[in-house]
Amino acid sequence: LRYAVNDHLIAFWHRFVGPNMSAITAGGGSEVYDIIVDRAFSEYMGAAFEDICLDFTRRHAKEVMGVTAQEVGQIWGHADFDIDVAGRLLDGTHFYGECKWRSAPIDRRIVATLKERSDKTAYGRGRSGHQLLLFSRRGFRPDVAELPSVDASIHLIDPDRLVFEPTLAPRDRPDDDAADSPNGGFRP
């Protein structure tokens, strides 16, 4: 039986802090960071970023693609590729996504690769159209940033959008006078 830590903050502690506690408590925290953490941080964050993107897709598919997601996961095990985010919306439309935690904006080559991979996979075969999600730590090159205005099936998600707040239903919106009400604005 094998267990994995599903909380990235705890996983970070167990990967970088715990094993180096003696050096850190001896005053070598900066050195631990420079020699160990800094060298492995991008790799560590790449996997964490994929999980963040999957969670975002589960929660916000309707806001992004117009329909709630029925299933969200990843495609692994192909000889020549994996797909970071994949799933199906309630209307049967499939979607595929690429998550990039890198220091450069996403370019057209990455978009083309995702299109090629989405066409190769057996998941969603026979579908009539699909949507593409591109998640980027550093945004998108100008030629990629204009793609959603030309092709409505392409969705670009940068860090600002990853932390977006959904629109509250009218019954969930706080009243202006909620603080003055006897029950503090609570609604059953």
Kindly give the residue locations of the regions a language model identified.
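Flexible, glycine-rich phosphate/dinucleotide-binding loops
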Residues: F12, P19, H94, R141, ...
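Extended hydrophobic-aromatic, low-complexity segments
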Residues: S22-I24, M65-V67, D82-I83, T93-E98, ...
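Conserved catalytic cores of phosphodiester-cleaving nucleases, focusing on short active-site segments
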Residues: T57, I83-I106, L114-E116, L132
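Conserved, well-folded catalytic cores of nucleic-acid-processing
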Residues: H60-V64, K120, D151
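Basic, amphipathic alpha-helical patches used to engage nucleic acids or provide basic targeting signals
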Residues: P105-R127, L147-V150
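Domain-level recognition of nuclease-like catalytic cores that cleave nucleotide substrates
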Residues: G126-P188
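Conserved nucleotide-binding/hydrolysis micro-motifs of P-loop NTPases
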Residues: I10, W101-A104, R138-R141
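Accessory nucleic acid-recognition modules appended to NTPase machines
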Residues: L1-D82
